Amino acid sequence: MRNRWAMASRRPPDETAAPLVPEGGDLDALRAAAATCRACPLWKRGTQTVFGAGAPDARIVFVGEQPGHEEDLAGVPFVGPSGRLLDQALEAAGIERRLAYVTNVVKHFKWEPRGKR
């Protein structure tokens, strides 16, 4: 196991995502940029870009790690098992999902079943 302190003290990479973010920064421009992003190899295996969904002016935003299998196929975040759990939690809290915005940190991902590691 790597030393946690050694990992934390590493310099950040010289490259950033800043050049990939379009001028103006509205959600539609960002969605288009994500759809054509080739900055990392994840786009090669994903079925499609899974951007965000919901109210653009939402006061509540949920951010997951990466799309799951159902999200990859649908092109919409949080429609699989995690989405069903989120829906139950929102209902219990009295929050309408349409008032929230859901997205993932990673926009391209292809889930593959694997054996035990």
Where are the regions a protein language model picked out?
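A polyanion-binding, active-site-adjacent surface
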Residues: 2-117
